[in-house]
Amino acid sequence: MSRRYLFTSESVTEGHPDKICDQISDAILDAVLAADPSSRVAAEVVTNTGLVLITGELTTQANVNFIQVARQKIKEIGYTNADNGFSANSCSVMVALDEQSPDIAQGVTSAQEQRDKLSDDQLDEIGAGDQGLMFGYACNETPEFMPLPISLAHRLSLKLSQVRKSGELPYLGPDGKTQVTVIYEDGKPVGIDTILISTQHTETIGALTDNTEIQAKIKADLLEKVIKPVFVGATVGLSDSTKFLVNPTGKFVIGGPQGDSGLTGRKIIIDTYGGYSRHGGGAFSGKDPTKVDRSASYACRYVAKNIVAAGLAEKCEVQVSYAIGVARPVSVMIETFGTCTVDEDRLLEVVQKHFELRPAGIIQAFDLRNLPSQRNGRFYQDMAAYGHFGRTDLDLPWERLDKVDILKQELATATVA
């Protein structure tokens, strides 16, 4: 008997309060690393009505105007009208950054292996910036090897922002959320059950002042300008039974930091796989690549994606764990949920042979310190909204499939009978 179930993932637009904070944190990271690639950064941001607070730890030789960076990012997102309670030009921006603890710095700068063995291996010079566990995931549900629910939710959120910024739907505000419920049968997506969009909007739309008429127009416009375009060419499409919910509270005029406070690192499931895979709990934004919450999660995605792309599994989850100041992972685990076509013990051996999972090795393989300067001062901030994985609009090193051939070659004789 086939098993039928529903799975839901959500996304938010770049104007969501928490995502404003993530983007400012990563804009600061970009600016600092572009000027001094060896910087240590842990930038946290809080927003509320008319207020931005930048806090955290920072060790750098760079001279960065953090207030200017924050205002520019807020303007780019679309908060330019003080009448909305939050504006790039009028909000207060406070900065309270401390230097990184020397107790942490000594462990990150000189790994425990090097101190014990006096090794000259440069990849052992940088230990993990903290203890912890990280996950990466990939599956064959979409061309970008992402779970379908989060892929669709992100595409809807991005399209929602695009039609606002282009002026196609000028009455939309920057704040918004999307949610997609996918129908599965025997683990395969077969349909779309529900699409939910909540979007900030103006009090009136043209001559329309009645809220019932306003909400009807918003729903009709979003169906034609946002939802249908996202599903063009989709392998799983809309149907007559698909439910569409738009602004189900009835109104969404007050939004952004005026409607809700924001904080860096509160959208970690949206940043990753939409709840489809496990999560180690660590956020990404505002953290330099010595923080394994970020860099090791990217490496795990790289491993999982290449495994699935090589046809070795239909879905793959990779976990690593670290001890602070120690370069080599404490543990590495690969889970393929019964879909692996080769011996899993042999697969783990090959992964550990060909994928660099030490923090310094990850940084070197992906060039994580230098990408901000190489890309005109912006790299991390472009992932701070709409996800860090499966981004076909960005050139992300952990999304490359350059390990597929070596995996196939090494595992050609390890096929499970």
From Swiss-Prot:
Keywords: ATP-binding, Cytoplasm, Magnesium, Metal-binding, Nucleotide-binding, One-carbon metabolism, Potassium, Transferase. Binds 2 divalent ions per subunit. Binds 1 potassium ion per subunit. L-methionine binds at E57, Q100, D260, K291. The keyword ATP-binding applies. One of its GO terms (molecular function) is methionine adenosyltransferase activity. Pfam families: S-AdoMet_synt_C, S-AdoMet_synt_M, S-AdoMet_synt_N. It catalyses: L-methionine + ATP + H2O = S-adenosyl-L-methionine + phosphate + diphosphate. This is S-adenosylmethionine synthase. It comes from Picosynechococcus sp. (strain ATCC 27264 / PCC 7002 / PR-6) (Agmenellum quadruplicatum). The gene is metK.
